[in-house]
Amino acid sequence: MTDRSSLTLVLAAGEGTRMRSSRPKVLHEVAGRSLLANVLLAAPAGKQDRLAVVVGPDHQAVADEARKLRPEAQMFVQSERKGTAHAVLAAREAIAGGADDLLVVFGDTPLVTAETFARLQAALTGDVAIVVLGFRAKDPAGYGRLLVQGNELIAIREQADASEAERKVDLCNAGMMAFAGKSALTILERIGNANSKGEYYLTDAIGIAREMGLRAAVIETDEDEVRGINTKAQLAEAETVMQARLRRQAMEAGVTLVAPETVFLSADTTFGRDVVIEPFVVIGPGVSIDDGAVIHSFSHVTQSSIGKKVSIGPYARIRPGTSLGEGVRIGNFVETKAAVLESGVKVNHLSYVGDAHVGTNANIGAGTIMCNYDGFDKHRTEVGAGAFVGSNSSLVAPVKIGAGSYIGSGSVITREVPEDALVVERNEQVTRPGWAKRYRERKAEMKKPKT
């Protein structure tokens, strides 16, 4: 933590053409969150911290995503793409507004952590005007090299301009930078475009700061944290890294992952104590899982609240709007959606529970379907506490099943069932003794060869 004020500037104006997608690059997702969201939620968010996002002229969706997550964020448009420094100066108004520290980060680096933002700020001490985030690359080819003398960064050399000796340097530029607020705008406004592309490069700030008698420094982080996303392949690589991070955090918090590499979590998944997740489970966004819950193999859960000691699966699908109370049992091939199941409810086999409220200790038999859609609108089903719904029943919504009532197997329920009543809605069984034997004999006679 620091008592200095900050302005975090997120550069999110890139086209992302190599993604081969109509969606803006920073809105692609890692662990159930957009690339941009992962960056914004890692950025400083204290009372003294401000946030600005630079977007492209046709990227209203990017601005909307940023405001959804950080409503206080200022938006700036980079009308022409003329380099990284040009993008930063698109937010000149925000920079001029003043802050002790200016933090610049790309919106396509979803693995960056809050700790790294804090370390960048902490390194802005004394006459250090710029701090650059670096990493040791396994293969530095293509990266800008950070050239250091002692504790001072003297230059960022791009691959094409590097000497043979400089190309052997494995300390590379991650793209994330911090500026001392008092000198930031002066340095940025001195960056020119005298290069082959006619663009304004943020990396030129190092030389300008040194010409002003100021120092630049480097802090290092792991290569995985600063992965930039430009292709779908890189998106998949970032997902792999993020999932490994989330699994490790979950296990360190006491969650049992039987086969961690087969479980997929979301960045916002929350766990209680003694949760067990079996192999091949997918947890989508917006899920909380309380103490002692067990999610069995091949289950999918998203935007739902899972209560204490709940058992789910195997092969269950828990869809958005589901709330499962303590001790609820959801068995194999059960699907729930927009449903509240109070404590002790059992839905053990082959059922659909949608747009419903199921009271405490009710039992929903195998093959029960809540028929919630009439082709135009969704309707709700209410099942009272302690009700027993027999196997292969259809509850045609809107309908209310009274507390303590019994529904006979195979029934189609279209009207309200009173409390403690028995309802059986099916044709009376007809038994014809000897019919099957006579039928087989007749069929066998018909199949005999004709002479």
Curated annotation (Swiss-Prot):
Q: What is its main location?
A: cytoplasm
Segments of this protein annotated with the region N-acetyltransferase: 254-451
The residues that the entry says bind acetyl-CoA are: A366, N372, Y373, S391, S409, R426
Kindly report, in one word, the top-level EC class recorded for this enzyme.
transferase
What does the record give as EC number? 2.7.7.23, 2.3.1.157
Binding positions for UDP-N-acetyl-alpha-D-glucosamine? Answer: 11-14, 25, 78, 83-84, 144, 158, 173, 230, 319, 337, 352, 363
The record's comment on cofactor binding reads: Binds 1 Mg(2+) ion per subunit.
List, in alphabetical order, the GO biological process terms annotated in this UniProt record: cell morphogenesis; cell wall organization; lipid A biosynthetic process; peptidoglycan biosynthetic process; regulation of cell shape; UDP-N-acetylglucosamine biosynthetic process
Q: In which pathway does it act?
A: Nucleotide-sugar biosynthesis; UDP-N-acetyl-alpha-D-glucosamine biosynthesis; N-acetyl-alpha-D-glucosamine 1-phosphate from alpha-D-glucosamine 6-phosphate (route II): step 2/2; Nucleotide-sugar biosynthesis; UDP-N-acetyl-alpha-D-glucosamine biosynthesis; UDP-N-acetyl-alpha-D-glucosamine from N-acetyl-alpha-D-glucosamine 1-phosphate: step 1/1; Bacterial outer membrane biogenesis; LPS lipid A biosynthesis
One matching Pfam family, short form?
Answer: NTP_transf_3
Q: GO molecular-function annotation terms?
A: glucosamine-1-phosphate N-acetyltransferase activity; magnesium ion binding; UDP-N-acetylglucosamine diphosphorylase activity
Q: Could you tell me which PROSITE patterns the record lists for this protein?
A: HEXAPEP_TRANSFERASES
- Which stretches are transmembrane? none
- Similarity comment text for this entry: In the N-terminal section; belongs to the N-acetylglucosamine-1-phosphate uridyltransferase family.
Q: What is this protein called?
A: Bifunctional protein GlmU
Q: Which organism is it from?
A: Afipia carboxidovorans (strain ATCC 49405 / DSM 1227 / KCTC 32145 / OM5)
